[in-house]
Amino acid sequence: MLPQWMLILSVFGFLILVIWIGRLTSKWIESSSDFFVTGREISLLINACAIGGIGLSASVVAAMPMFSITLGFWPSFLFYGSMWAVAVIIYGLTIGGFIRRTGAYTISEWLGMRLSTKTRVICATCQLLGTISVMAANIAGISAVLVPITGYPYVLNVLAITGTFLLYTFLGGMWAVTIVDVAHIIIGMPAYYIVISLLLAKTNLLANLPGADWRLYSLTGHMPLFRLTFPSMITMGITWLVFVFGSQYYWIRLTSARSERAAIGGAVWGGVGAIIFIMGPLALLGLLALDLVPGQWAPAQAWGQLVGHSLSSVMGVWMIVAVLGASMSTASTALMGTSSTAMRDFYQRFFRPRATPQELVNPSRVAVLIAGVFTALLAIFYPGGAAWLLAVAAAWFGPPAVILVLTIYWPRITPTGSFTGIVTGLIATVAWQLGPYWQTTMHMIWVAICVTLVVTVIVSLLTQSERGRKSLTTELDEYHTQLMSLLRQGRTTLGAVVDGMKVDGERIYHYLQYLMDMGYVKKEGETSLSQVTFSLTSEGNDMLPALSTEEQLSAKFALTPADAAILKYIATTNNFDAASLSEASGVARSNINQNIIHLVTHGYLLESGLWRRTVKVSPQGREIVDKL
């Protein structure tokens, strides 16, 4: 057992660090947008680090050494770890830009926009149950690992870890979570590389590894390739795709990005970085444990056995802090996914639809606390531990993943088709999991995909009349006018409209549907990015008040007078202070970010900054300033 004083000091020091990060970032929180999606300021590099760092989560750290022992190094590296990273890369390339352009905080919010409220509610329920299961799995996994190493009871470990990540998330929201994500990579990655180097030298490059012919030198090892049960190559790949595409965990990462480029690049480079820098060392740990640790022990204990018996006290404590940080980081991101769903899809949608982002900050923090309490209870009392909790999450994420992809690429999906598909898919998946067949015949992930897909497509084809449905709105009001004004100003993406109007996305989509029915607004297309890009028709333009001379001049360049004032101020002062920009433009300080994003989108400002966004005027922007 590791020295208690060293372990306590190191863990306590790390906990103080993350709480300090939460306290620091709490000063950046002025609205629910700041709390849940960082005001959409996360840079490509930070997003890539945060997403890639998920590969160091406690569940992956425990599973990869185990699979190296039972299946072989290459199956663990290629078919488990790298399959997850490839799923993240595919996610970024196929729908990363779409996620950022929708402006939706949650998967469920988008499904409510595109389909119906009842589909949104079912999906949101799946997200709540699934992300809480993921959180509980990570907490249960690291807490169980720490019991034999530290001597502390399992329940105490659960409460201490949950309480800490709850505190810094409560204070700093997604900002705190993101910085902790990067911090745990900086702290943890050197430990893994030092340990791997020392132990490879100690074992003479695994010269005496038991079963080296298949564990190290066979590409497939003992891994079945095309079985429908788990583990197999094809089932692992599909499971990771469903986890990534169907989870709010990854959606909120990409919708927090400062641009579509940062969303796509964050996922792609995060996945590439995980393959290159993370998955190999994790897979090697299992082989090193098998070679170095004597006696009989379960493969699932490989990480703990290696840390407890083959490392010096300093390196052992360092590894514990590394995996503790990774576990808390992963769990806190899932916590943001859970609380954002609870707030956006239930509280704001049904109880406070017209609440301002500032009014939603404290309820958002309460949602974080409630989700954390449920997570701790599930980790303590759920039978079966981390593995079963992850299996449960697969059941919840499967049907939403199918519906999400269909809404993006298949325009014939209908509200009734989606609702019927997601409900039957969910029921079938849970029922299949309760029996023995998911372990012996076919994993439940295949049931989730097949049932949801088949039912959704068939029912949608039978209910095509719903595609021409009219909006429930019957007359123009101030929200319709505000929406058309935003489109006239060049805010043509759904995300720009959602951020500009600061109300629930489903409500905004109903406004857009009515305006399209009336011929005032048109949608650029029916699939992918085109279905979330809009423009004002000539009839719609005629419904708005005439522009003043100043507004007409600015409108030639897709700007408002406030946009122009901000651009001029930055060009002449190089000052990006929000208070100064607010004073110069007359725009409320909390809304300045939307003007900045608009100017960046049109190429008038160039953005940079590792953490917070900084900008400078582009050559194109200076030309506009001269003309204005």
Task: Go through the PLM ranges and name each one.
Residues 482-490, 565-573:
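Short amphipathic alpha-helical elements of helix-turn-helix/winged-helix folds
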Residues 1-478, 495-500:
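Membrane-embedded helix-loop-helix hairpins and adjacent transmembrane boundary segments
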Residues 469-482, 541-565:
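Short alpha-helical segments that sit at the start of domains
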Residues 503-517, 586-601:
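Short amphipathic alpha-helical interaction segments
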Residues 528-536, 611-619:
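Minor-groove-contacting beta-hairpin "wing" of winged helix-turn-helix DNA-binding domains
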